[in-house]
Amino acid sequence: MRVKNYREIRDEPVVEEPGLTVRWLVSDLEEQPEFAMRLYELQPGAATTPHVHGWEHQVFVLAGQGVVIGGEDECLLGEGDVVYISPLERHQFVNAGEEVLRFLMVFPIPRGDAYTETHNKTQ
């Protein structure tokens, strides 16, 4: 068992995603867990680049307001909302509010080239 406070984990800017920071709460650097957990903070007016992954992930919105765009669908997001994104589903997060959009993301840790490419975007 491990317990830590998220404030003790450094937030890092995500390369190529202005206005987005990440805290690696649980990662593959810790005894090879099967799932990772990240805390993202997206600044007002900022958006992630539309992208896809070969793995599913779940998102829990902690604070703020935004929009998640998946394919042809757009859904408003707010505190307490949960999002499931299927493998290979194109998606994007947009902060449509006046405060930071803060959300947790949990996903299986992909192995191999796909993971290396995604992981390096935050270095």
Kindly give the residue locations of the regions a language model identified:
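A short, N-terminal "cap"/entry segment at the start of jelly-roll beta-barrel domains
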Residues: 1-34, 114-123
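Glycine- and acidic-residue-biased ligand/ion/polar-headgroup-sensing regions
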Residues: 55-66
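Cofactor-binding loop segments of dinucleotide-utilizing enzymes, especially the Rossmann-like FAD-
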Residues: 63, 71, 108
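Short beta-strand His + acidic residue motifs that chelate non-heme Fe in jelly-roll/DSBH
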Residues: 48-50, 68-69, 85, 91-97
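A short hydrophobic beta-strand segment most commonly corresponding to one strand
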Residues: 39, 84, 99-114
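Conserved short histidine dyad/triad with adjacent acidic residue
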Residues: 38-53
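Short acidic-glycine-tyrosine-enriched beta hairpin
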Residues: 72-87
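A generic "binding-loop/recognition-motif" signal
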Residues: 54-55, 73, 89-90, 99
